[in-house]
Amino acid sequence: YLRIVTVEEEPRVIELYGKDILKAQHAYGTNGIITAMDYALTPAKDWSHTIALFNNYAAALDFAKQAQEENLDAFLMTVVERRFAQYYRKLTDYFPPELDAVFSMIAPEAVADYNARVKDAGGTVSLAKTLHEIEEANLPPAWECGWNHTTLQALKQEPKVWTYLQVAYPRPFDPKLVERQMKRYGDELFFHHEMARMDGQIQIFALPILRWASKERTYEIIHEMEELDGCMIFDPHVITIEDGGMKEIDSTLIEFKKEADPYGLMNPGKTRGWRPEMAKK
C-alpha cells in the first residue's frame, strides 16, 4: 500500500494497493509525494553475525552458493575477497589479509548447520555474535560488511582511488566466470558477491570496486562484462533511471506521473520517459 499526494494546485491523495504500487515503485521521487506505506513483516530473529574464512575465493563462493541452493536460513550472505581486509580495520582479528571471507547473518536455529557446513567446506568460523554482542564489542554488524557498505569501507580510506560497478550474473550462476573476471582485471577490480533471490530464483550479484582510470576505461570494462560474460550492469555513473538499471522506459510509471505530477516538477531529468511537452500547460 502507498499513499501519494499529487503535485498540483489543489493536491489530491491517491491510494495504491497490491500490484498498483508498481506505478510509483522505483520511480526515484518522480511520481508524487509518498506520505505513507504499508508492507509485510515477518517475526524478528536474533541473527548471528558471522565471518567464515576460506583459503581461496572459489571455496568461499562455492560455500555460499551451496548454502543458498540448500536454503540455509540466512538474512545476508556476502563473499568478500581478501584484498578488502585492509579496509575492515575493526575486524583485523577476524578477517586477515591472507584469507577470503563470507559475511553472513544466520538464524539462531540454523547456526549448528552453518558451522557444520563451514567445516565441511574447509573453512573456519572466526566470528559469531548476536547484534547485542557485536555492539558490546564495538564491531560492525554483518550488514555493514556487504553490498554497497563494502564499497563505502574502501571509499572512506581511499576516496580518490575507487568507484564501483553493479553486476547481475546470468542464471544459472557459473563460479568459473568469476575466476575468469578476477584474472582478466587483476588489481583494477576487487570483488565481492552477494547471494540473493529474484522471482523465486537464485540470483548472484557483485558490486566490485573499480580502480578509477578514465570514463573510457570504465565503459570498456562494462562492455566486456556485458558482451563477453553475459552480465547485466546497473550503471551507477548515470543520472536517469533507464540508463542505470531499468534499461527501458516504463510506460506505467510515465502514465502515473501524468496523474501525480502533471507539471513534471519532481526530480526533473531523472527519467528519459518524461518529455517537456508532456507537462500540463
Question: Which residues does each predicted region cover?
Answer:
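Conserved glycine-rich FAD pyrophosphate-binding loop
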Residues: 123-281
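C-terminal substrate-binding/cap subdomain adjacent to the FAD-binding core in PCMH-type
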Residues: 1-147
